[in-house]
Amino acid sequence: MKQFYIVDSSMLPEVVGKVIAARALLQNGEVKQVSEAVKQVGISRGTYYKYKDYVFLRDPEMASRKAVISLMLHHDRGILSEVLTTMSQVQASIVTINQNIPIHNWASVVMSFDISALQGTLDDLVTKLGDIRGVSDVHLVSVE
């Protein structure tokens, strides 16, 4: 299994930053060929190919934490709105919502949301959602 480290760039050889810069030139379309990119940043093609698949900038999107919950909502006006208001109050940023049609007046809902700025714990959120009138079977499905 691979191990990954987060390391301050000042601790790495200068070529690592240049490889990342060369890759960015290629991805952004500023240059068309590897030879142009490496010439522009001042490294050899061999150095680029040696490191290109192993060094990356930290992606801010990957730094966010995600959670998925499932719940059942009674088919009454305003219940989903109250769930979303509760999510907003604790700074849970909704990423996706999937609501099925109500069967016997109950609809299943699965929501994924960003919890990187969550105020409180996931257990508190699950409890708050379960306390809403018309909400039942609140389950935390996964956390990344």
From Swiss-Prot:
CDD domains named in the record: ACT_PheB-BS
Residue span, ACT domain: 68-143
Coiled-coil spans in chain: none
Annotated signal peptide: none
Protein name: UPF0735 ACT domain-containing protein LSEI_1046
InterPro entries the UniProt entry points to: ACT-like_dom_sf, ACT_dom, UPF0735_ACT_dom-cont
Matching PROSITE patterns: ACT (PS51671)
Domain of life of the native organism: Bacteria
The family this protein is said to belong to: Belongs to the UPF0735 family.
